[in-house]
Amino acid sequence: MTDSTLYFVKAFFLGIIEGLTEFIPVSSTGHLILFGDWINFESGSGKVFEVVIQLGAILAVMWIFRARLWQLIRGTLSGQRQEMLFTRNLLLAFFPAAIIGAIFIKAIKQTFYHPGVVAVTLVLGGLIMLWVERRAPRSDGSASETATEERATAHSLEEISWKQALGVGVAQCLAMIPGTSRSGATIIGGMVAGIQRKTATEFSFFLAMPTMLGAAVYDMYRNIDLLTSHDLGAIAVGFVAAFLSALLVVRAVLRFVANHTYRGFAWYRIALGVVVAAWLAF
């Protein structure tokens, strides 16, 4: 296998990793950093590769929710109150990360984008998820709900308040640190704010659209001169792989959260963080 072919195989592999992990609370960026380091993936485009292949994953979400997305756009433009309120909530949740990201993202990438940080944030994020999911279980012993769920005031996207949406947006800012997980921060942040788990997951999917599109376009704009034709080919391969794998994951996640908690993902994060820390130590 030639070096060029191996380069594209690695890009395809990382695209699969991106699609599988973007919409579950385990940190896709953290996994890309860890697996990219493991397989010695060196892209001349740097972190642009990681951001742009996320477009493949987000387009998968847009495809799955295309009917609801079109309804939202059409309703907002025609002045329908329910759709306008939902659009307002998405914008409120989007702007905190957009503002902080535009100002600090370069410093964040230079400071935090390495496996040691990922190990720490994986463990901390897992512990926080366990805390949220384990807050005083229901008296009937239900395995799929907790007191956090019982206290939820928003059980549908239309019931989310502007304060809850803003709280999700603030939580999303934490996801700029690799290993935190954008989906994990927004879903858990939503649950703490009083949004029911499945609804928080759906809102996280919709919020991913402007957030990830904006991040990808911004990174491309800032680094377009650094991209070579070789890098663009690798990005295209990773993009397609992320799109196809994300198509499978999004539907599976929606089915999963209807009947399960996120505890399994929390324990996975903790275990992976410990393994990475041990690997770095020895």
Swiss-Prot record:
HAMAP family: Undec_diphosphatase. InterPro entries: UppP. Catalyzes the dephosphorylation of undecaprenyl diphosphate (UPP). Confers resistance to bacitracin. Pfam families: BacA. Belongs to the UppP family. This is Undecaprenyl-diphosphatase. GO terms for cellular component: plasma membrane. It is found in: Cell inner membrane. It catalyses: di-trans,octa-cis-undecaprenyl diphosphate + H2O = di-trans,octa-cis-undecaprenyl phosphate + phosphate + H(+). GO terms for molecular function: undecaprenyl-diphosphatase activity. The gene is uppP. It comes from the Bacteria. The chain crosses the membrane at residues 6-26, 45-65, 85-105, 112-132, 200-220, 230-250, 262-282.
